[in-house]
Amino acid sequence: MTTDKPYRIQTPSGYRKYLCSGLYMPSVTTVLSATETEKAKAGLRNWQKNNPGALEAASTRGSAIHLGCENYLRGLDPGVSEEYQDFWNGITPYLDWFDTLHWSERPLRPDWNHLRSDDREVAYVWSTEHLYAGCPDLIGEIGGVKIMADFKTSNAPYSAVFPEKGDRLGFGGFRKYQKCAQQMAAYRLALAERTGYKCDVALIIVSTPETSQGIFIDTDQLDRFEAKFLKRAQQFHEMESAKDTESSSQ
């Protein structure tokens, strides 16, 4: 177990990188975004073109809900503005399920303080074996079951079931679920590598203007999503290595 403090670095391209244990590594979300299919990347670019400002608005909304969850879990006023109340309503019952909290954006137990950055208000988990890093939203227990949770806001529900042909909304929800599940599986593995604590279950808490969802992912499913993510992490590092080789030859 290392005691080196992790740091986050924003690259000129907008990708997040971390310096952890003396190694530079990408964020989990960077790996997932960079290894999307060309069709998926083109679809995102087209959506952004047709919905100017929507991506930034979604990011601001997500940050507000994340902060509300963090405040609520600490017994503080959530402080969620009226603008986002439709997304906030319905989330707290899922947060109330937890009877033990180990992490809310950063460690709540002293033996994990080596995961904090120097400013101590942020913390990360990382894998020196697979070279990636990131920040889980919530880690705790419900009746002794070790659970990692992630907060998501969306204009439409997530779906763990592959949709019927032609169901574009359902397909979007399925893709979001798949991406989030891989993200959480990656965090779970990195947390275990850094602390020895391995979550049994993951929970995606999704809030939309009309409803909220709590989607559980069991151990077997997490193991499968972990394998998928590790393939993408390997692909990412191969892509970066090829770029470095090309640059050095010019």
Regions found by a protein language model. Name each.
Residues 33, 37, 236, 245-248:
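Compositionally biased non-globular segments, especially hydrophobic aliphatic-rich helices
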Residues 74, 80, 96, 195-196, ...:
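Amphipathic alpha-helical interaction segments
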Residues 106-241:
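Mg2+/Mn2+-dependent nuclease catalytic core
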Residues 1, 241-250:
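Glycine- and charge-rich intrinsically disordered segments
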Residues 1-133:
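Metal-dependent nuclease catalytic cores that hydrolyze phosphodiester bonds in DNA/RNA
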